[in-house]
Every structure is written in C-alpha cells, then in structure tokens.
C-alpha cells in the first residue's frame, strides 16, 4: 500500500475523491428533484 502513495500524492487523491463525491451527490439530488415523488422543494402537497 505504501508504494501506491509513493506514486500518487495523498492530498491530490483525497481532493479528487471528495470532489467526485460532491459532484455525485449533487447529480443524485438533482435527479431526485426532477421527479414528482421525491421533489421536496416544489412537489405536490399530499
């Protein structure tokens, strides 16, 4: 495992992982907001 961190800078790897997870979370939330069932902002009142 230590050889992997000699190839890649751990700071850049962590920034990349967190950036990817943030983009993925935004995409999932916008997909849910585009549906009628899971739109918690402007959905139909039940």
Curated annotation (Swiss-Prot):
SUPFAM superfamilies: Light-harvesting complex subunits
Keywords: Antenna complex, Bacteriochlorophyll, Cell inner membrane, Cell membrane, Chlorophyll, Chromophore, Light-harvesting polypeptide, Magnesium, Membrane, Metal-binding, Transmembrane, Transmembrane helix
Top-level division of the source organism's lineage: Bacteria
Topology with respect to the bilayer: Single-pass type II membrane protein
Topological domain ranges for the Periplasmic compartment: 34-46
Organism: Halorhodospira halophila (strain DSM 244 / SL1) (Ectothiorhodospira halophila (strain DSM 244 / SL1))
Protein's name according to its UniProt entry: Light-harvesting protein B800/850/890 alpha-1 chain
Protein family per UniProt: Belongs to the antenna complex alpha subunit family.
Quaternary structure and interacting proteins, as annotated: The core complex is formed by different alpha and beta chains, binding bacteriochlorophyll molecules, and arranged most probably in tetrameric structures disposed around the reaction center. The non-pigmented gamma chains may constitute additional components.
Localization annotation: Cell inner membrane
Alphabetized GO MF terms: bacteriochlorophyll binding; electron transporter, transferring electrons within the cyclic electron transport pathway of photosynthesis activity; metal ion binding
Positions of transmembrane segments: 13-33
GO biological process terms, semicolon-separated: photosynthesis, light reaction
GO cellular component: organelle inner membrane; plasma membrane; plasma membrane light-harvesting complex
Residues exposed to the Cytoplasmic side: 1-12
Chain sites annotated for binding a bacteriochlorophyll: 29
InterPro entries: Antenna_a/b, Antenna_alpha, Antenna_alpha_CS, Light-harvesting_complex
Signal sequence range: none
PROSITE patterns per UniProt: ANTENNA_COMP_ALPHA
Functional description taken from the UniProt entry: Antenna complexes are light-harvesting systems, which transfer the excitation energy to the reaction centers.
Keyword Ligase: no
